[in-house]
Amino acid sequence: MTEYTNLPVKWTNGIVISDERMMLDPLPSEVSAVLDAPINYSYRYNELRRTHSLKLFGVWSGYIPSHADKHLMIFQLLQQEKELTGDEIRLALRQMQGSIKLPINDKLLDSLDRYSLIFAWIAYAGCLDSAFWQQVCADPKCLVYNPDDNLKFSLMFSLARQYSATTRICSADGLRIPSQISPDLGQLAFDLVFNSSVRQTVWFHANDFPAFDFYTKDVGTMVTFHVNFLYNMTHCVPFKTKQSCAEYLIQKAHEAWSVYCGVLNDTIRHRLRLVEGVGIVTLDVDLQILAAVGWYLPLLVYTIRSVSGSDISEWLNVARREFRDLNCSSMINGEGYVGVPEQFWTIHATSKARMWPRVKKYTCDLTDLYNGDLSSTVLGEGASETGTVKWFDVPLGPKVENFRVVGTRIGALSRANVIYNYEDPSDNCDLARAIGSFVPSLPTSGTRDTNGDLEDAKKMFDYRVSQNVYSICQKGKISSLVSRSVKNLRASLMNGELRVYKGSRLWALRAMLFSDKLRYKSDGQVIDPYESHRGKITVRLNNSSLKMLSAFVTLIELAMAQSSGVEDNMLNGRGLSPLQVRSDREVSRVVIAGAINEPLVGCLRRMYPKLSVIGFGMDAVGENERLTVEGASQRNLACDMLISDIDQTFYSDFTKMCNVTVKHALAFSSWSDYVLMKVNYPSSHLLNEIKQALLSRGFSRIVLPVVMCGQNSFTSEVFVYIGRAGVGGHVDFKNNWFTKNDILMRRYRHMKAPLITIPQVVHSVVSKCVTKHDTELFANPGSIVALTVEYASAREVVSLISEVCSPVWTWRTGAGANKFVNIVGMPSKARAALTRRTDEHYYLKAFERNIVGTSFGMYKGIPRIDALNCVSWVTIFGAAMRECLYWIVDTLKVQYNEVISIGARNMTDIEFIKPSVKLTCYDEYYANPQDLATHYNVNYENKYFNWLSPTLVNDSVYVANFVIMAPTEGSESPSATEQLDRIDSVAGAMAKSSITRMTFVGNLYDSRFLADIALSSLPPEGLKVNDTRTTVQIGKYPPCAAVKPSAFLERMKKYKGVLSYHVYPLGYDRVLKTCADNLWIPDVAGSPMLAFCQGLSYAFYITKPAIPDEGIDQFMLDDMPDDGSGSVTPTQSPSPSPSPSAAANTEASTVVEPIDNLNVVSPTVPGQPSQTPVNPNQSTELQSVAKPGIVR
């Protein structure tokens, strides 16, 4: 680093982190226009306290009122004790805009320098009482600056010294201004510039700050410095009390946490600052420690995880406890040093500019930090695409002859012309149907198996969620997914478009969304709200609101074992009214545990005015009670129903977490006969401990974990029903115990320690005309192709982009005057795999017609492009199974020249097939198969596959994804025996001597988990099961018989020695991989079914030549460490389970779970090493041997 030796204090070349707030400062000529634009604001009125809150945003956020502004209409209105209307506020703000002018003069209007809004608003507020600020207003040249100048505002600081307006802090002179530069106008606080009670910030000119004495011995000094500096100027905040300084440091730590979340998630959004930590000069060790928390990320993560709220003593206790393990004590010295992680250092380039002099760079693996509690901000609902054209066509037109991309004017699409939504797409779902829908996971073992149960649960608790898993899991936040549905439902209810009847789920939603008192007609129909109340009764929802309402409905249905029914708002039986969990009396009291400011409390009071509803929690506010479960011994919480949303994620010790969760379950069960409690770590051990503790205390209870609509799409949490009765009387499982292979336990394990590689979603924009051979485009999912091209070349460029992307959006922003077409494409592996089968390029068939000015769309606004897609769980299920089948083919390392895909209607298999491999598809419905044959060498057979007399091809792979159970034309769905006959027929043909090398992979429905789904209240959209007849019906297809895995294995026994065969379960990690690969989010109604994809179907394989007999059964069951080439190498004996560090690594091991209770032996595969050495970097303490076991 360069050292500046000519300064009073040695300065080193520190990190320069740009503060983009400078870019918000306008040119002097723009000041009038930006101040006159409509003001963005937020307004709230507290009916209980009769107080207003009004905050301004944008250029007006820095406005500080003075006594001269008291006469303005806005401040007169804010003194009234009633809620203001939007029209009143907007009119008053317009009047304020006309009255307030910032200091500017005509001499500056031609300047290209920037105008400092921060100092301008201070000058405006201070000019009445300060000679210095009066002079600044008289000469507004003081307020402009050159962004490239290292000595900004020299004139203003010179005036400050002349008028004795500077203040001395630690031997350096600076300019003191209020820290509160964006006040709440509802507080009616004036003259903040000179109010000594307001926290002040001292700004230093670049020539003055080197005199600052970092080594002050004054025990009363408490000065903090921000790590990134607006205008490249250092500023500090002096404090008078230790309490206020500590609160400030914790606030900055919370802000640093938010920044860390954004960087860790690779979230692309406009950020004003990228580091929020502060340096501190003080001799107080406690404050030094709190400052270190904000910028030393390991300490920050562990503190945030362990402390609820901003309790100073708790922050200090946690921080001190972690010092010895985190090796950061040397960085705490109270001399103003700031720690910056190496990742931030490399992301934001260093510079020779004189900046923060005391920066320490340290190494910290961000992805290695546990991030289970991180939350990302969602962008809200998507915008209309009206006016754009969305292309899905495969290029099947004429050849593109002699087109050269190099000669075409192609540029990057300006961000001013498009909005990219990298967060959650909005799902316009039927909330009335979805709310309260749940699917249970039944216990399956007649006895409790404690062999390795505790150890496995501890390891899962300690595993750190990998960055790859975390990134995709953060994409399914329920509040964003339902934003469009909530908005539309609110409008429909307010406009009287829906009839709402008491007792329906729509009634429950109505009570959640609006705060007015419910009024009814004689038939139970809810009367529309008063006209004067509309717009004032909207309830603000949080991310848990719909989940808690869903939990309430779920608890009723579990307890009463009766569907409340809401198809078209019609009731099934009594619905939700009256509220009963026993037939002899109505519910009189409901308790909500873990409430903070829980909207469900008010919702239930509106639904049931006579009901007593108590919300309590350790962070409760408002009408809820600040109370803990442990501290409730003197509070009567006996109730009819109890719902707990208490988190366990802040516990860092497994034993403590487990003990507290069990104690809570016991307490809740003593207060209520019907409980639904959240469990964040649903291991079989913990659920069995709850069950065991209840039995030991003499409680006869059903213990049943469920997942519900309303939870985040990819959460691993469950809600555990603990009830005296219910579940439709189906209590044959009541005495069963949970195993780690039950559905929701498997989901939990696969999320904490995925057994296959899940890709990292990396959002990026590619601004070039990509071709089908640009393989780097698919290195990680998340890329977007965005460019602007001349209209004359748009046909060719859109056609070429369509070879790689699907869909592709196009639009023009004007007719005639605009000669360019904007193009945005989503890269598609399937599309690129298809078009790579030839070196030729083809037009879209649509371009065979004449192209006119509107052919590419006309759009005058800014379109919003969703980088993610909300899709049905059925789509995810089918794609995950397809990926699983081709993974099996790769794992078997078979050689083949042709793939025969049976039932490949949409060429969904194409992305897994190399361009050099011949592809034949059997599907009776595909249109124009000849075009695919001539353009891309894909042979389509428009007919059913002949299952009973198959003609097989040597050196081939046959793939049957969800077709073995499908009927052929004119026939009914095959029974389980008939499905096995189909497989047997293919296997018999394979066994003939004419076939020397061939592999057959497919899937069947599994009968073992149908009871779980059959007990769901409203089966997810597109699914019907009959656990008595063991049938599954998806979509509009007829019911299909399920087949036990053991039946398949029994039927194949006769081919042992000639063919190799086995079954393989679909894991939840493969479901996550499918969602990440395709940028998919499950729709709200079907998201609970994602976990049950694991048990609804299983894969099988049959291959020839046979794998040696001694290894056949175990081949697909043992751990298979990834050899780094994308293939999987079988091992001779079970491999260690991945350690936490290995689980977090993107090169995660591939581990296969057993699917049945089989007598298996170790494999020996020709040409493969017999054993893979253990990674020496893995922790031996956390390794365990994977053992075959029973799934169901």
From Swiss-Prot:
<keyword id="KW-0506">mRNA capping</keyword>
<dbReference type="GO" id="GO:0005524">
    <property type="term" value="F:ATP binding"/>
</dbReference>
<comment type="function">
    <text>Outer capsid protein involved in mRNA capping. Catalyzes the last 3 enzymatic activities for formation of the 5' cap structure on the viral plus-strand transcripts, namely the RNA guanylyltransferase, RNA-7N- and RNA-2'O-methyltransferase activities.</text>
</comment>
<dbReference type="InterPro" id="IPR048606">
    <property type="entry name" value="Reov_VP3_MTase2"/>
</dbReference>
<dbReference type="GO" id="GO:0004482">
    <property type="term" value="F:mRNA 5'-cap (guanine-N7-)-methyltransferase activity"/>
</dbReference>
<keyword id="KW-0946">Virion</keyword>
<keyword id="KW-1153">Inner capsid protein</keyword>
<keyword id="KW-0547">Nucleotide-binding</keyword>
<keyword id="KW-0067">ATP-binding</keyword>
<protein>
    <recommendedName>
        <fullName>Outer capsid protein VP2</fullName>
        <ecNumber>2.7.7.50</ecNumber>
        <ecNumber>2.1.1.56</ecNumber>
    </recommendedName>
</protein>
<feature type="compositionally biased region" description="Low complexity">
    <location>
        <begin position="1140"/>
        <end position="1150"/>
    </location>
</feature>
<dbReference type="InterPro" id="IPR048607">
    <property type="entry name" value="Reov_VP3_MTase1"/>
</dbReference>
<keyword id="KW-0507">mRNA processing</keyword>
<dbReference type="GO" id="GO:0039625">
    <property type="term" value="C:viral inner capsid"/>
</dbReference>
<keyword id="KW-0342">GTP-binding</keyword>
<dbReference type="InterPro" id="IPR048608">
    <property type="entry name" value="Reov_VP3_GTase"/>
</dbReference>
<keyword id="KW-0548">Nucleotidyltransferase</keyword>
<keyword id="KW-0511">Multifunctional enzyme</keyword>
<feature type="compositionally biased region" description="Polar residues">
    <location>
        <begin position="1159"/>
        <end position="1183"/>
    </location>
</feature>
<dbReference type="Pfam" id="PF20790">
    <property type="entry name" value="Reov_VP3_GTase"/>
</dbReference>
<keyword id="KW-0489">Methyltransferase</keyword>
<dbReference type="GO" id="GO:0005525">
    <property type="term" value="F:GTP binding"/>
</dbReference>
<dbReference type="Pfam" id="PF20831">
    <property type="entry name" value="Reov_VP3_MTase1"/>
</dbReference>
<keyword id="KW-0808">Transferase</keyword>
<keyword id="KW-0949">S-adenosyl-L-methionine</keyword>
<dbReference type="GO" id="GO:0004484">
    <property type="term" value="F:mRNA guanylyltransferase activity"/>
</dbReference>
<keyword id="KW-0167">Capsid protein</keyword>
<feature type="region of interest" description="Disordered">
    <location>
        <begin position="1112"/>
        <end position="1192"/>
    </location>
</feature>
<dbReference type="Pfam" id="PF20832">
    <property type="entry name" value="Reov_VP3_MTase2"/>
</dbReference>
